[in-house]
Amino acid sequence: MDTMFDTLLQLPLLQGLAPEDFTSILEKVKLHFVKLKAGETIARANTPCNELIFLLNGEVSATTTSSDGIYSLTEFAQAPYLIEPQSLFGMRTDYTAKYVATTEVNSVRVSKTAVTGHLLKYEIFRLNYLNIASSQSQSLHSKL
């Protein structure tokens, strides 16, 4: 059985990070663990993305509504999953979808301040972040 430490190291943004570096991060960065029941909202569309939200377990639905409100698209994702890392920076820093737990979900949240002040100092974190944000952006573009 994995410990919480092992589980966190398996998250996509932290994969490849040396355990010593992760221990150093834990000393400086406050992690907010949140447990949600099925049906509870994790993040709302058109609200500021000011933290990274990692799903540790469970499943979520992501519903995106067209700008004219005529239609919406719902997709499902299972943990491990990072909610909209591309929305943390850039010109549009609001969530583009509404995220709702479809099962019980455990998540960990890290503030944007912690990301910019501590996590981006680690090359492996920067590379993982760029790869994940790029992959999600490319995936969204291919759906157009």
Annotate the PLM regions.
Residues 1-33, 37-38, 82-83, 87-90, ...:
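Cyclic nucleotide-binding regulatory module and flanking cytosolic helices
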Residues 5-7, 98, 108:
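Short hydrophobic/aromatic segments of transmembrane alpha-helices and their interfaces
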